Amino acid sequence: LWLWKIAAWSMGLAVMAYGILAGTGIGMSYFRAQKSPRPKWLRPLHYTIGIILVSLVLLLLTIGIVGTLGHFGNLGHSPHLIAGITVVGLVLLSAVSATQISPKRPWARPLHVTTNAVLFFALAYVSWTGWTVVQKYLN
């Protein structure tokens, strides 16, 4: 049960981190569009929260695999596995594309923004499938 508590807290924090990242990302976009200097703390905060999100989804992946193998002995009991792997992939793609954003790589920013838009729906789906998995464990 303690493992699922860690997972629940981690998922809540991951969703919160995503919200903060959306806010800081929109803020950076606003300052760029206005051609005005952004606050010096904004980009480091965005990167730091991004690193936290990557860490949280990797922790969630580990908990999911260990917990499912420990409880069932194998994986693939629900769509939650595919949803979780999709979220991990999107978060990693977002993180890698973020490191590539520069005037020399005009493809990186649209990839980063689009990935994060898709991630919104993936997080909603993985949250829903996760809720159904938790109900299985509680029954």
Regions of interest found by a model, annotated:
Residues L1-N139:
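Membrane-embedded alpha-helical bundles that constitute the cytochrome b-like, heme-associated redox core
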